[in-house]
């Protein structure tokens, strides 16, 4: 809003020229979302308690019994903070801003439906797997179609760490893109099992993609770093910054011991939009690097289920996802969280190294 109303005044008052800079508006968007989350957080948590939106805890993890009743659906706070920040600082005529917001809100709506169902049934099982997958596929399909019909968008798959190595998937890029968004959404959802465990790596991934997206939208930087250039995409840097701010504000209350959980409304939306951001800046495979922690958590579940069926009842891990395995081995929750955060930061740095190793 500030960009649309104030930047035209720069021709008469040079001070307003600052609103044209993506870097300035990105920092402002981050701080706005962060402050909104921190200021409104206590009231929001109190409101959730009044509505009795308490989390139902997995019975197999005895150490989590004390967390029963902790308010959930904290992702709504992130959605509100993000929305206000975007309204103030983003260029509201930019189609990519609206597409990113659609993905975040769309996956969030599926998560909200799942969370509400859990609360109504008073157990830790929400909507059916088919219903959840159907909702995710619907949102991802719409988002991919919007990207695919864009003449500036390419169906080429970029291979990280290699100079100008691409594969044109053609129409197969559509289902591939849908898979990326849905897989990322569910991967973050699986990781959201300890206080602050999912939001920390999500913030790191969002920071990494904000850098890639800024470069993708800048013709000079994109040409120098051999990144596919897409005009207008740089504005999504503001979306990324606002999401980082909203995530940090949420982490203020979600850090161990958590006062609120993000719920599926938060985890599904964050994962889905991370997938979209990777597709938007043509760094689809880099998502597997910066989101390596999410990949490991997902693979642990796949291995556990496959091994259980193959051996007729034996388990490969003590419990899946992976963070529960470490819990049952006696590693303190706070130590697991910090170590996973450190791992995600290292993976983020590795992902950024793609820019120079090309």
From Swiss-Prot:
EC number per UniProt: 2.7.8.13
Membrane-spanning ranges: 28-48, 70-90, 92-112, 133-153, 165-185, 196-216, 233-253, 260-280, 285-305, 335-355
Recorded metabolic or biological pathway in which this protein acts: Cell wall biogenesis; peptidoglycan biosynthesis
Family recorded in the similarity comment: Belongs to the glycosyltransferase 4 family. MraY subfamily.
One biological process term in Gene Ontology: regulation of cell shape
The keyword Transferase is assigned to this record: yes
GO CC list: plasma membrane
Catalytically driven reaction(s): UDP-N-acetyl-alpha-D-muramoyl-L-alanyl-gamma-D-glutamyl-meso-2,6-diaminopimeloyl-D-alanyl-D-alanine + di-trans,octa-cis-undecaprenyl phosphate = di-trans,octa-cis-undecaprenyl diphospho-N-acetyl-alpha-D-muramoyl-L-alanyl-D-glutamyl-meso-2,6-diaminopimeloyl-D-alanyl-D-alanine + UMP
Taxonomic lineage of the native organism: Bacteria, Pseudomonadati, Thermodesulfobacteriota, Desulfovibrionia, Desulfovibrionales
Enzyme kind, highest EC tier: transferase
Chain's role: Catalyzes the initial step of the lipid cycle reactions in the biosynthesis of the cell wall peptidoglycan: transfers peptidoglycan precursor phospho-MurNAc-pentapeptide from UDP-MurNAc-pentapeptide onto the lipid carrier undecaprenyl phosphate, yielding undecaprenyl-pyrophosphoryl-MurNAc-pentapeptide, known as lipid I.
Predominant place of localization: membrane
Cofactor(s) the record lists: Mg(2+)
Key words of the record: Cell cycle, Cell division, Cell inner membrane, Cell membrane, Cell shape, Cell wall biogenesis/degradation, Magnesium, Membrane, Metal-binding, Peptidoglycan synthesis, Transferase, Transmembrane, Transmembrane helix
Domain of life: Bacteria
Bilayer topology annotation: Multi-pass membrane protein
A molecular function (GO) term: UDP-N-acetylmuramoyl-L-alanyl-D-glutamyl-meso-2,6-diaminopimelyl-D-alanyl-D-alanine:undecaprenyl-phosphate transferase activity
A Pfam short name: Glycos_transf_4
Magnesium recorded as keyword: yes
Localization: Cell inner membrane
Organism this protein belongs to: Desulfovibrio desulfuricans (strain ATCC 27774 / DSM 6949 / MB)
Name of the protein in its database record: Phospho-N-acetylmuramoyl-pentapeptide-transferase
């Amino acid at each position: 809003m500030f960009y649309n109303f104030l930047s035209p005044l720069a021709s008469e008052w040079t001070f307003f020229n600052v609103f044209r800079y993506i870097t300035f508006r990105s920092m402002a968007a981050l701080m706005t979302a962060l402050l909104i989350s921190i200021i409104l957080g206590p009231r929001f948590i109190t409101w959730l308690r009044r509505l009795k939106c308490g989390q139902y805890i997995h019975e197999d993890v005895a150490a989590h019994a004390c967390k029963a009743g902790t308010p959930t659906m904290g992702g709504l706070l992130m959605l509100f903070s993000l929305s206000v920040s975007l309204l103030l600082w983003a260029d509201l005529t930019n189609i990519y801003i609206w597409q990113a917001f659609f993905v975040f809100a769309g996956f969030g709506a599926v998560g909200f439906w799942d969370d509400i169902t859990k609360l109504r049934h008073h157990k830790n099982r929400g909507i059916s797997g088919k219903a959840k997958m159907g909702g995710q596929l619907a949102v991802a399909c719409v988002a991919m179609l919007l990207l695919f019909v864009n003449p500036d968008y390419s169906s080429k798959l970029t291979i990280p760490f290699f100079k100008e190595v691409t594969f044109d998937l053609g129409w197969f890029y559509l289902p591939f893109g849908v898979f990326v968004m849905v897989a990322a959404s569910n991967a973050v959802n699986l990781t959201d099992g300890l206080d602050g465990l999912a939001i920390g790596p999500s913030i790191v991934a969002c920071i990494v993609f904000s850098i890639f997206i800024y470069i993708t939208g800048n013709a000079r930087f994109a040409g120098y770093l051999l990144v596919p250039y897409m005009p207008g995409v740089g504005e999504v840097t503001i979306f990324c910054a606002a999401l980082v701010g909203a995530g940090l504000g949420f982490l203020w209350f979600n850090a161990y011991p958590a006062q609120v959980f993000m719920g599926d409304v938060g985890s599904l939306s964050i994962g889905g939009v991370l997938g979209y951001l990777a597709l938007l800046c043509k760094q689809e495979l880099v998502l597997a690097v910066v989101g390596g922690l999410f990949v490991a958590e997902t693979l642990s579940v796949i291995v556990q289920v496959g091994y259980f069926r193959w051996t007729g009842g034996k388990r490969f891990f003590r419990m899946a996802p992976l963070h529960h395995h470490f819990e049952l081995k006696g590693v303190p929750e706070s130590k697991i969280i910090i170590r996973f955060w450190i791992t995600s930061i290292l993976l983020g740095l590795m992902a950024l190294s793609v820019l120079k190793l090309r």
